[in-house]
Amino acid sequence: MANTKSAIKRIKTIERNRIRNCAYKSVVKTFIKKYLKVLSDYTNAPNSNGVENIQTTLGIVYTKIDKAVKRGVYHSNKAARMKSKLALKYNVIKK
């Protein structure tokens, strides 16, 4: 246990930030799962508006990832890797 007042405050701050970071990560993971679901639905039954749904969902996922980077939840290189993997899946489907 912390002995000084500043160390006690620091523990509270760290715990608050940890919970916040977990929430941001959860949101990003949720939207990635939604994107992958849209992709799988399109591969099972291709239709004209499926591509539009994929593109809009991909844009939303990119936004969520970028906001997580801005808030310091993810490193920019990790975000770039995540976005690259998602774009690769889209490009494979598009061909």
UniProtKB/Swiss-Prot annotation:
GO terms for cellular component: cyanelle; cytosol; small ribosomal subunit. It is found in: Plastid, Cyanelle. Transmembrane segments: none annotated. Keywords: Cyanelle, Plastid, Ribonucleoprotein, Ribosomal protein, RNA-binding, rRNA-binding. One of its GO terms (biological process) is translation. InterPro entries: Ribosomal_bS20 (IPR002583), Ribosomal_bS20_sf (IPR036510). GO terms for molecular function: small ribosomal subunit rRNA binding; structural constituent of ribosome. Disulfide bonds: none annotated. Belongs to the bacterial ribosomal protein bS20 family. Binds directly to 16S ribosomal RNA. This is Small ribosomal subunit protein bS20c. It comes from Cyanophora paradoxa. The gene is rps20.
